[in-house]
């Protein structure tokens, strides 16, 4: 069917290496490829000849989100710092959403994003890497205070760590 074969990309051959450029991917890094075209066969026009190649495939690890939280418990309140790092498809998703937000709402949106929409979390000192740098991972750093995340029962503390509610 033509429906599966109607996506055009550009191939640049530089110093014997092939780079596949997809104009529909606004934030993708050079030498990185959207998951939807990875592993697909490509037909490359070369004057009167043609070449057949395949878009490289990457392991899921390439799209990893790293989250590092350093947490303190003081008076039944969590506080600390966090570093979130986005790679591959997850990075592109964050970049696309951020670019679509009006400039006067970007700071609030970053704050909402950092606290995962959880009203019990206050964030401050937010900093981020360059949203336009396609070659490096995207990082978001911030300090936080989390209310209503610690329950004390006798000598035991029960701590809510799944702020994004991934496991609900």
Map each language-model feature to its residues.
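A sensor for short, sequence-defined functional sites
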Residues: 2-168
């Amino acid at each position: 069917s033509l429906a599966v074969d109607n996506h055009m990309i550009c191939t640049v051959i530089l110093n014997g290496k092939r780079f596949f450029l997809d104009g529909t991917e606004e934030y993708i890094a050079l030498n990185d490829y959207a998951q939807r075209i990875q592993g697909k066969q490509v037909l490359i026009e070369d004057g009167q000849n043609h070449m057949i190649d395949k878009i490289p495939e990457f392991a899921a690890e390439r799209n990893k989100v790293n989250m590092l939280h350093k947490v303190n418990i003081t008076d039944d309140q969590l506080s600390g710092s966090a570093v979130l790092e986005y790679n591959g498809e997850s990075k592109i998703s964050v970049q696309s959403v951020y670019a679509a937000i009006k400039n006067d709402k970007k700071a609030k949106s970053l704050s909402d994003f950092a606290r995962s929409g959880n009203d019990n979390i206050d964030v401050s000192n937010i900093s981020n890497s360059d949203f336009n740098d396609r070659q490096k991972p995207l990082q978001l750093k911030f300090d936080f205070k989390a209310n209503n995340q610690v329950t004390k029962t006798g000598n035991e503390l029960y701590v809510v760590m799944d702020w994004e509610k991934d496991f609900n």
